[in-house]
């Protein structure tokens, strides 16, 4: 058992023991209110009267998430370089440790937030922590948002950016022999689709993929979708709305580039080793774990972690930065990046 697995197991045991004690020895696994950390509960309570995304416009949804993320007090100092990818009008940002121009390992980061929201304003703190704690360069793709641009635009733009930086690795001093793809939520969806595309198109290969509470299937028929249909935070109706914004009305949502769980065995067998993280109180929990099982069963070295006491987007949300789940999972992610990108540490 690795060090992070030991720490996670210890946290898991302590948290369950605490909940059992509070509930007279009964573990109320189906009671979401009893299964979230106090910091998380405070955040959930603070937004309980806010309109859900499916009752506002995409622009309002973006403003609302930006407002939640407005506390930048935890943002760490980094250097950023904005790049326009060839003639594709795709914007990306290279993020490095402050003052460090060394040829560092690369994390190709694909952000989440429902394909509709998100960018450096929402993800800046999180990716900056990865940059500084793992000592890597992050390539952050500012892909076009839905519904202004529909599927597959976002995936195409991310792939174009990947190929561009691979072709210009020397110019930007990037170690493309040491590249990991990381994505959260819908970014996790696109990250694993990108990993499949690199094989199909013989593009640059990822050494590893880290998928954080990823969107894996549009079927929306798992037990966790039933248990957490109304949240907290992410609900079934919200996911339905996100898919509506992302795709055209007659789009088949079951194709692998939208629902990666449906990829062929061959496509999955060639995926890179994987760390997949899900959270306890999340409609996406079960599909993420089902994907981890499928990868593992098809021979892909896979680590799957379920983090207790928290909600979807917990790594992203600035109000949750001090929660035990966020701190521990950041440590897991950073340690895994270091293990993969540091010579003789694999």
Curated annotation (Swiss-Prot):
Signal peptide stretch: none
For this protein, the Enzyme Commission number is 3.-.-.-
Keyword Hydrolase on this protein? Answer: yes
Compartments, as annotated in UniProt: Virion
Taxonomy, superkingdom:
Viruses
Q: Which GO terms describe its molecular function?
A: hydrolase activity
Assign the protein's first listed, main location to one coarse class. virion
The alphabetical list of record keywords is: Hydrolase, Virion
* InterPro entries named in the record: AB_hydrolase_3, AB_hydrolase_fold, GDXG_lipolytic_enzyme
Classification via Pfam families: Abhydrolase_3
Q: List the disulfide bonds.
A: none
Residue ranges spanning the membrane: these are none
| Primary enzyme class | hydrolase
**What Gene Ontology cellular component terms go with this record?**
virion component
Q: Which family does it belong to?
A: Belongs to the AB hydrolase 3 family.
This chain's protein is named Putative alpha/beta hydrolase R526
């Amino acid at each position: 058992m690795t060090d992070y697995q030991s720490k996670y197991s210890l946290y898991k045991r302590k948290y369950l023991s605490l909940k059992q004690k509070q509930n007279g020895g009964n573990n109320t696994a189906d009671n979401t209110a009893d299964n979230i950390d106090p910091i998380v509960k405070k955040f959930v309570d603070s937004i309980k009267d806010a309109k859900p995304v499916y009752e506002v416009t995409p622009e309002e949804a973006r403003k609302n998430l930006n407002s939640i993320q407005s506390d930048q007090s935890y943002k760490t100092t980094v250097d950023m370089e904005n790049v326009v990818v060839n003639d594709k009008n795709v914007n990306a940002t290279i993020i490095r440790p402050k003052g460090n121009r060394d040829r560092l390992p690369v994390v190709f980061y694909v952000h989440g937030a429902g394909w509709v929201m998100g960018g450096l304003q929402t993800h800046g703190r999180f990716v900056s922590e990865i940059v500084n704690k793992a000592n890597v360069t992050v390539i952050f793709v500012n892909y076009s948002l839905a519904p202004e641009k529909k599927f597959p635009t976002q995936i195409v733009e991310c792939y174009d950016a990947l190929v561009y930086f691979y072709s210009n690795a020397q110019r930007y001093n990037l170690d493309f022999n040491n590249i990991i793809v990381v994505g959260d939520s819908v970014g996790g969806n696109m990250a694993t689709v990108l990993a499949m595309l690199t094989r199909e198109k013989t593009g640059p290969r990822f050494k590893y993929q880290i998928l954080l509470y990823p969107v894996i299937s549009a079927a929306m028929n798992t037990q966790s979708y039933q248990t957490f249909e109304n949240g907290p935070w992410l609900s079934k109706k919200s996911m339905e709305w996100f898919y509506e914004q992302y795709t055209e009305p007659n789009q088949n949502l079951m194709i692998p580039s939208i629902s990666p769980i449906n990829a062929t065995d061959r496509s999955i067998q060639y995926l890179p080793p994987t760390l997949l993280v899900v959270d306890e109180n999340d409609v996406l929990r079960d599909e993420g774990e089902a994907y981890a099982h499928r990868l593992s069963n098809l021979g892909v070295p896979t680590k799957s972690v379920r983090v207790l006491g928290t909600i979807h987007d917990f790594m992203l949300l600035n109000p949750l930065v001090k929660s035990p789940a966020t701190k521990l999972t950041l440590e897991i992610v950073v340690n895994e990046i270091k293990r993969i990108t540091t010579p003789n540490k694999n």
